[in-house]
């Protein structure tokens, strides 16, 4: 007798729950109706080949070339990648020169006369307008060696106002005493009293004359004593 127990052994022979679909299988085995896609449970199935590189190819950690050999095979090699170097860009301008005839040089020959005079250069004050009218120059530039004439070699123009004459001037007015009104040389003072033309009118209505007002009745009268004022509480008392 086998040690294995199944549901078919516990049911009677004519039980409706016991059908031919129930099989005596082990807990670790799939049912008979499942496809045998697992190569471990189906020894007759061919082994599944993983997708990707073929078994003979060795994966390389670098994106180019064979697997490096040496002390550190996992470190990618340094330096430029193998193969011919990339071509350098051509030297010169980025765009070709324009073709066709080039424009010629500008017009040559006598230029037209300008239609406006040249601006005059700034001159020092007092210098003559015509340069030919200037006096002879000395060894020190603009300083003339001869006597100076009016308008020669001067830096400032001749004044257009004569200097004041040194003639007699009117005497200054005498000093005024402090507090006295200065004389008024212009106009005259009107005669009569100064002030408003008429006195101010008296205020309308009668106002009470200020004086002594009656004292209101005080309900709290202090009785007069022999000394005139009552003794203060806590103060000294006189004993008779």
Swiss-Prot record:
InterPro entries: MISS. Residues 44-66, 74-122, 159-185, 193-202 have a biased composition (Pro residues). Residues 1-240 are annotated as: Disordered. Residues 16-26 have a biased composition (Polar residues). It comes from Bos taurus. The keyword Phosphoprotein applies. It holds the Pfam family MISS. Residues 34-43 have a biased composition (Low complexity). This is MAPK-interacting and spindle-stabilizing protein-like. Belongs to the MISS family. The modification Phosphoserine is found at residues 2, 6, 15. It comes from the Eukaryota. The modification N-acetylserine is found at residue 2.
